[in-house]
A protein has these predicted regions:
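Bacterial N-terminal signal peptides
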Residues: 1-4
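Aromatic-Pro/Gly-enriched surface loop or interdomain linker
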Residues: 10-92, 98-99, 209-210, 216-244
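Short alpha-beta junction capping motif
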Residues: 21, 87, 92-133
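Alpha/beta-hydrolase-fold catalytic nucleophile elbow
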Residues: 24, 124, 206
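An acidic, glycine-rich "communication" segment
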Residues: 29-37, 128-216, 226, 230-231, ...
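Extracytoplasmic/secreted envelope proteins and their assembly/folding machinery
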Residues: 57, 61, 108, 112, ...
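Surface-exposed patches in mature extracellular/periplasmic domains of secreted proteins
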Residues: 70-80, 123-127, 155-164
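Alpha-helical scaffolding within the catalytic cores
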Residues: 75-82, 104-110, 185-189
Length: 244
């Protein structure tokens, strides 16, 4: 059983933008939250792919404009569907809550082609069983993500990253990966999607939710230190993707 994703309110990004933050819109699996008001009304917080939109997208692109030489602005974000060939126009795809994805064969094929062409994927806001549970044959959100990647790019593999990887020093010099997630008592892990030559094609923020920090940092509603780290990580990810 699946729920159709609610339509987004994504606008067309400015044609002058060098970088567009492309968020993947997907059909979701049946899902259950521990909170009754969300369990009984799954769309009360929006579909999983929508979480933290559009504030987090606007915040990251705005900071890229202010802190780097990348030509972009706070309106340079866009929602995309994997079935649409427009994904090949964007070097960076952002997945929110990928543990709830329900991809069809064409979406899987396009995702594989996108990655092989050099596109970079970022997976965020998913975690080990505890807060959320998927009803179905796969219950661990990471395994759902791994499942689709193994179909899309079976020759690639997910590896645990440590602080020595260049992505953590691309623009900001990240001092530690030991950070607190915005909620829960999970311990964040950083996983990379690498090809047979060890080249990095994507990163997964497991047991973490950088987008949640991005959404709230300028509102004074987030813990300052991990929120700053999460923003630095996001900018590093984008610049790494654009330069590799």
């Amino acid at each position: 059983m699946v729920f159709l994703a609610a339509p987004g309110t994504s606008q067309d990004p400015p044609k002058s933008s060098e970088f567009v933050f492309a968020r993947v819109q997907f059909t979701q699996r049946r899902w259950t939250h521990i909170w009754p008001e969300l369990r009984d009304n799954p769309n009360s917080a929006g579909p999983p792919w929508w979480h933290d939109y559009p504030k987090s997208d606007r915040f990251v692109t705005g900071l890229l404009q202010e802190l780097t030489r990348v030509r972009t602005d706070p309106t340079s974000f866009h929602n995309v569907e994997l079935e649409n060939p427009e994904i090949f126009n964007y070097p960076f795809l952002y997945f929110s809550e990928p543990g709830f994805m329900n991809l069809n064969d064409q979406e899987v094929a396009n995702l594989g082609e996108y990655i092989r062409r050099g596109g970079f994927v970022m997976a965020d806001d998913f975690r080990e069983p505890g807060i959320f549970r998927i009803v179905g044959e796969m219950t661990d959100e990471f395994e759902v993500f791994r499942h689709y990647l193994s179909r899309a790019v079976p020759e690639y593999r997910l590896v645990r990253l440590d602080l020595s990887h260049p992505i953590f020093h691309q623009f900001f010099d990240i001092a530690t990966l030991d950070m607190d997630p915005p909620y829960g008592d999970f311990r964040p892990q950083f996983w990379g999607l690498v090809d047979e030559h060890g080249k990095l094609h994507g990163i997964a923020d497991y047991n973490n939710d950088l987008g949640d920090y991005w959404e709230d940092l300028d509102q004074g509603e987030a813990l300052v230190r991990p929120a700053v780290w999460s923003t630095q990580l996001g900018i590093n990810y984008v610049l790494y993707a654009m330069s590799h």
